[in-house]
Amino acid sequence: IIVSANRTHRTVAEMAQTTWVIEGQEIEQQVQGGKEFKDVLAQLIPGIDVSSQGRTNYGMNMRGRAIVVLIDGVRLNSSRTDSRQLDAIDPFNIEHIEVISGATSLYGGGSTGGLINIVTKKGQQDRQVDLEVGSKSGFANSNDHDERVAAAVSGGTDHASGRLSVAYQRFGGWYDGNNDALILDNTQTGLQHSDRLDVMGTGTIEIDDNRQLQLVTQYYKSQGDDDYGLWLGKNMSAVTSGGKAYTTDGLNSDRIPGTERHLISLQYSDADFFGQNLVSQVYYRDESLTFYPFPTLTKGQVSSFSSSQQDTDQYGAKLTLNSQPLAGWDLTW
């Protein structure tokens, strides 16, 4: 198994750090059983903390330390630790996941615990159509159900291949054992009453036996329903006088929590570049992260509501050369 997250495309046996590769079939099996993507990672990756059941992956550390998340080598962590890196892709589009445990400086700061590189599915030479439909319910009431549908078409020739996919999931309400709706997280936001859309296209050109050109594009949007929110009681009693907060419809807000992202990456590799292995990549990522309005208390009374939104535009380039100048010696720069 070749690991690309270390930029040198080495095998697991050649890696000095503890490394795992989780195949897409394992992830799909867990997702089809009703688990959310972050819960699957917490179960399959040793040493990673259990997820918060919401949109955020805040607190999901590896062996107690922070992690970096990438999609096909493109870093998703931003300068603000907003913890939306795993709200990034539908499992339908995952080929496998590479996990490197321990501190690594290859992809910048924030990776003292390790890194998770999500490798997306690519097109095959043979024409193929994939379709997936699923539903989950706790049978509490008519809102207690999730639905998902995904489709992909891929194909190509000996020298070129591509894949186009669309995955959509609708999350309904979540309820406890008494059939009461669980309270929405109005800080990091949850997944109840939300929609997720993941559109992805990939293309690969085999220039010759050594050289390859690979393109990855993605549009991802995961957003709450603009009709559901957290009711804080009459006169905000839930935060001022110990009243009860609960989830209900009737929300009217211009700030709907969610994640929206565009990503494009172009990678060129040459296994015999003047006797060296060359891997280069240029990429662009823009995203908008929106949070719920949140009350501020002054002398026991709500004085204001505030909401935050982070807009990010990131572009970059990487170039790695790997060679063996002497037997048993590897040189990477």
Descriptions of predicted regions:
Residues 2-32:
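N-terminal periplasmic "start-of-domain" segments of outer-membrane beta-barrel proteins
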Residues 38-75, 95:
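Extracytoplasmic beta-strand/coil segments of soluble accessory domains associated
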Residues 39, 59, 74-101, 151, ...:
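Short acidic/polar hinge/loop motifs at secondary-structure boundaries
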Residues 81, 135-139, 183-189, 247-255, ...:
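Extracellular loop and loop/strand-boundary signature of outer-membrane beta-barrel proteins
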Residues 89-132:
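A beta-strand signature from Gram-negative outer-membrane beta-barrel systems
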Residues 142-172, 180-227, 260-271:
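Transmembrane beta-barrel wall of Gram-negative outer-membrane proteins
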Residues 142-145, 175-182, 220, 226-234, ...:
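Outer-membrane beta-barrel translocator domains and adjoining extracellular loop/strand segments
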Residues 204-220, 255-333:
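Face-selective signature of the C-terminal outer-membrane beta-barrel domain
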